[in-house]
Amino acid sequence: MTLFARIPKVDKILEWDGTKVLLGIHPRPTVLNAVRSVLDSLRTAARSGFLKEEELLEGAVASRIEREVARSTAFSLRRVVNGTGVVIHTNLGRSPLSKRVKPLLDEIAFGYSNLEFDLEKGERGSRYSHVERLLCDLTGAEAALVVNNNAAAVLLALSALAAGKEVVVSRGELVEIGGSFRIPDVMGQGGAILREVGTTNRTHPRDYHQAVSEQTALLLKVHSSNFAVVGFTAEVSATELVAIGKEHSVPVMADIGSGCLLDLSPFGIRGEPTVQEFVKAGVDVITFSGDKLLGGPQAGIIVGRREFIAPLTQHPLLRALRIDKLTLAALEGTLRLYRDERLALAEIPTLRMLTASAAELATRARSFARRIRRASPPDIRLTLTSGISQVGGGAYPLLELPTTLMAMEADGISPQEMEIRLRGMEVPVTGRIHRGRFLLDVRTLQDDDIPFIAAALSSLAD
């Protein structure tokens, strides 16, 4: 009898004791789907000649079915330990929220709220009112609006203010913002006509002056936060662009990307303009993200002059891009922390990680290492070494943040295997491999990550 013919049938598997236990815990369709999935993989292996006889033993098949049931019933979106040293890690969810936001999220998520109800007037209200005043107070802008992400904010602004007309932008600012989404594509989708000026590395005020015509709806400035052009370069500042716009009676819009609300230069973090700087420069419409340097949830934030924000609030596209109540609650909770700069720096994880000093990180690393060593097998070797962290999230591409790394080694386990096994844990642990060692960057580790790291390292000895 061939191995293919020996693969057990579904009805036989359902009679196994192990399967009956699973059926007593999980819905029958869940177990059946797991059985069929395992049988499909066994048949595929048999056809390709890679199936081994021991893989058909009842215990082996039952174990695979149990693992498949566990996989299919587990949440797909899970907590991950970020030991990569990339603070605003796009693939790991960007900025973690402050725990100060949790009480408000709990209240809004599990009950009714005044999302679109004016409690004073007893009539329909606006969901945007919950953060508009806050944003205006924090940035100095006249009006504000929020949507579901910054690309949506740019799309809405261009659709409302420049559909069918020209938008003048420097060639050096036609950036790709990630996921193959490019500024020219967003502009085209919004119905705007792109008018490029200058060159990749140099754009001058005269380039804008010469490009303005009766068809010009906007002068657009895009902050190149995710790359840097160095050497023989020239660009037109926001202040200069506003002056050009006023001379020609053309409004100015700026997509500044990361959306920093605090001056981080005292911490050695320079080069990212704050939202307030663009407002003071007189830019009419400013868009930025909520989940990058701001340290909140994914959102697209629009601030600026009332006469230019008003058309956005009436545009049909706004409903398709509108922010949901949980994101709105998380954003309001985060923004309220900015009323006290010291509180924001202490309580918003992204800011706390970015501004941590090298000495502070070294102290934390020694503390973390002691805790991990106490809970890990003796054959796990942990040493501390210096290294570099990155901001991530398309901000400060050239900035290197000094940090302390925990280097993990184990006999008989390569760094690549260690990385795979730690990533496969119930709470995955991610890090990076450099010069033959698996590394965890203390900057992006949280205090409550340590038990998960210790448990993951202990599993290596099993």
UniProtKB/Swiss-Prot annotation:
Cellular component terms per the entry's GO annotation: cytoplasm
Reactions mediated catalytically: L-seryl-tRNA(Sec) + selenophosphate + H(+) = L-selenocysteinyl-tRNA(Sec) + phosphate
Pathway the protein takes part in: Aminoacyl-tRNA biosynthesis; selenocysteinyl-tRNA(Sec) biosynthesis; selenocysteinyl-tRNA(Sec) from L-seryl-tRNA(Sec) (bacterial route): step 1/1
Alphabetized InterPro entries for the sequence: PyrdxlP-dep_Trfase, PyrdxlP-dep_Trfase_major, SelA-like, SelA_trans, SelA_trans_N_dom
Keywords carried by this UniProt record: Cytoplasm, Protein biosynthesis, Pyridoxal phosphate, Selenium, Transferase
Residues carrying N6-(pyridoxal phosphate)lysine: 292
Principal cellular location given in the protein's record: cytoplasm
Coiled-coil regions, chain positions: none
Localization of this protein: Cytoplasm
Protein EC: 2.9.1.1
Transmembrane segments annotated in the record for this chain: none
Listed cofactors: pyridoxal 5'-phosphate
Gene Ontology molecular function: L-seryl-tRNA(Sec) selenium transferase activity
UniProt superkingdom: Bacteria
Keyword Repeat attributed: no
GO biological processes: conversion of seryl-tRNAsec to selenocys-tRNAsec; selenocysteine incorporation
SUPFAM superfamilies in the record: PLP-dependent transferases
Enzyme class: transferase
Function: Converts seryl-tRNA(Sec) to selenocysteinyl-tRNA(Sec) required for selenoprotein biosynthesis.
Family as reported in the entry's similarity comment: Belongs to the SelA family.
Protein name: L-seryl-tRNA(Sec) selenium transferase
Species, as recorded: Geobacter metallireducens (strain ATCC 53774 / DSM 7210 / GS-15)
